[in-house]
Amino acid sequence: MAENETPLTAVKVEALVVMKIMKHCSQTFPTTATGSIVGMDVGGTLEITNSFPFPVVEVPPESHFDNAAANPAAAAPRAKANTVYQAEMIRMLREVNVDANNVGWYTSANMGNFVNMNVIENQFFYQKEMNERTVALVHDVSRSSQGSLSLRAFRLSPKFMTAFKENKFTSEELQKSGLRYQDIFVELPVEIHNSHLITSFIHQLQTPNIPAPTELPSSLAALESGPFVKSSILAPNFDNLALSIDPFLEKNCDLLLDSIETHHTETNNFQYYQRSLAREQQRISAWQQKRKQENATRAALKQPLLPEDEWQRLFKLPQEPSRLESMLNSRQVDQYARQIDSFVSSTTGKMFAVKGNLLPGETAK
């Protein structure tokens, strides 16, 4: 029990598990891929040693199920059939002496669009038990295709778990609890671990010889005929100086604008609720004032008074919409903004390099 009370501080993933997750997510791209991860908890570090994908039950097009999920793969981790499948797989892994403790699930993402209700409900399904030490691994296929692996680990914060369990996402409840969109997820650092044999093999690989320093070329012709241009090494790579806008950055800007539009729609819906509530409250106040005057007249005539709480039967206050969707959308906007901020750093440097040719009235010196 004392070990279970230690909070999770990091996630260590075996390199083979990372490769299996990448392969599964790439094969199903652009649709969502989900699967289970197994391992063990060692001193607050969650070690993930194996994984396996979830089967997706395809709903036939002629099916008329009203409760069928719009995206079966995204809802697969909490499906009843997959719960049985996962238990059977873990039992088989134990028979071959493999670490078979359920430590969470993984999912694929595209352009960082993983902040949605499916991810929230799946992680809540795994994390709802007391001290349930599970994480959600998110692999962004589009981001990884740019050359750097994007694998992140998330848990739902205790504050959000309490609010989601009680379904308290009204403005009053959010003000009392102080829950913000930044408090939805808790991100844990991810470390990729290789076995000692693989590490030894990597160190035994031959490294390319470092060329001796050469003198600077005296002209452009000397630079073009130099050894660096004819070599196959990546640097210097003059393609990096191109000013073309990265299509990945352009797509992120489009997604950011769509999320901001959704945010404005949610804001307009909430403002409509506030106007409707104000109108109903004015009608109730007018009715109560009129009823008080009637009771004052009846009291003067020594007649029985009319009930003053009858307005609860005559009037119906509008139901406040849940603020959960607005919170998730705000967290998604923050995710897109962070991605764009990391992408524009290289482009900004190029723009400053040619500043004299871009700004009117200035020339390059």
Curated annotation (Swiss-Prot):
Primary localization class, coarse: cytoplasm
Residues covered by the MPN domain: 11-160
Pfam families per UniProt: eIF3h_C, JAB
Superkingdom of the source species: Eukaryota
PROSITE patterns found in the cross-reference section: MPN
Record's keyword terms, sorted: Cytoplasm, Initiation factor, Protein biosynthesis
Subcellular localization: Cytoplasm
GO biological process: formation of cytoplasmic translation initiation complex; translational initiation
Molecular function in Gene Ontology: metallopeptidase activity; translation initiation factor activity
Entry GO CC: eukaryotic 43S preinitiation complex; eukaryotic 48S preinitiation complex; eukaryotic translation initiation factor 3 complex
Isomerase keyword on record: no
UniProt-listed Gene3D superfamilies: Cytidine Deaminase, domain 2
Function: Component of the eukaryotic translation initiation factor 3 (eIF-3) complex, which is involved in protein synthesis of a specialized repertoire of mRNAs and, together with other initiation factors, stimulates binding of mRNA and methionyl-tRNAi to the 40S ribosome. The eIF-3 complex specifically targets and initiates translation of a subset of mRNAs involved in cell proliferation.
Subunit description: Component of the eukaryotic translation initiation factor 3 (eIF-3) complex.
Entry similarity comment: Belongs to the eIF-3 subunit H family.
Protein name: Eukaryotic translation initiation factor 3 subunit H
Source organism of this protein record: Aspergillus fumigatus (strain ATCC MYA-4609 / CBS 101355 / FGSC A1100 / Af293) (Neosartorya fumigata)
